[in-house]
Amino acid sequence: MTQKEIWYETLHANFGQYFSVENVLYREKTEHQDLVIFENPVLGRVMALDGVVQTTERDEFIYHEMMTHVPLLAHGQAKKVLIIGGGDGAMLREVSRHQGVEQITMVEIDAGVVEFCRQYLPNHNAGAYDDPRFKLVIDDGVNFVNQTDEKFDVIISDCTDPIGPGESLFTSAFYEGCARCLNEGGIFVAQNGVCFLQQDEAVNSHTRLSQYFKDVSFYQAAIPTYYGGIMTFAWASQDPALRQLDLTTLQHRFHQSGLNCRYYNPAIHAGSFALPQYLLDALNVSR
């Protein structure tokens, strides 16, 4: 890959997107993944794994704010948070903004991701790797949740698409393990693709999660980087009330948190659970 070259995403066979490349900062094929970071004049630094864009400097805040602040503020008193994946450090960055959180454990299958993101995506982690509450575990996510004796208040699965190394993080074995190691009142969330184009992912996740959680749904956010625009996040807990908090409660918790966000706010939080009819029909549920 050379300067000014065009990089094509390969997630979809019949359509997709491209990025002009100003400079390739890093590329290495590790045991688990083909990693590349390059600079784009509009989106800043772009990270891709196995031909699929994972994050860009320009809009990563949308994804990471919604993946963290929605479950943490819905919980209200989270002390221990588990992040599966998230090697770029941005999920850790957002979780660490919650002063009430006492321990943040991140399980990443590939140590190489963490090391090169420290160097090449410094704005993503913003020094969060040095937070004394942070503990890094290099392990497979499925193995960890099924072997650990620890319990967590919130689990965030910052997984790749269900192909390659990320496939196991969409299985019943993983969801069962997550349900097992959540404290009472705990919440599980996971990225679930762009449902307009990857609807089967949401349907499969809904079916599998429903085996272990009483309340399973999804929420959404508009993230330009991901082709199709509207990213879907899986939500699972044993208490439907956590998903149905009134706006006044969310506003109070947000104010108390001291957070200053660029995308998330209490109204976005409440509205994000309103799902399009085509997804409700596919899930065979009513709202």
Curated annotation (Swiss-Prot):
Domain PABS: 5-238
Keyword annotations: Cytoplasm, Polyamine biosynthesis, Spermidine biosynthesis, Transferase
Main localization (coarse): cytoplasm
Pathway: Amine and polyamine biosynthesis; spermidine biosynthesis; spermidine from putrescine: step 1/1
Active site, renumbered: D158 (proton acceptor)
Family matches, as Pfam families: Spermine_synt_N (PF17284), Spermine_synth (PF01564)
Catalytic activity as recorded in UniProt: S-adenosyl 3-(methylsulfanyl)propylamine + putrescine = S-methyl-5'-thioadenosine + spermidine + H(+)
UniProt GO BP: spermidine biosynthetic process
Annotated positions binding spermidine: H64, D88, D158, C159, T160, D161
Function of the molecule: Catalyzes the irreversible transfer of a propylamine group from the amino donor S-adenosylmethioninamine (decarboxy-AdoMet) to putrescine (1,4-diaminobutane) to yield spermidine.
Complexes and interactors: Homodimer or homotetramer.
Annotated protein name in UniProt: Polyamine aminopropyltransferase
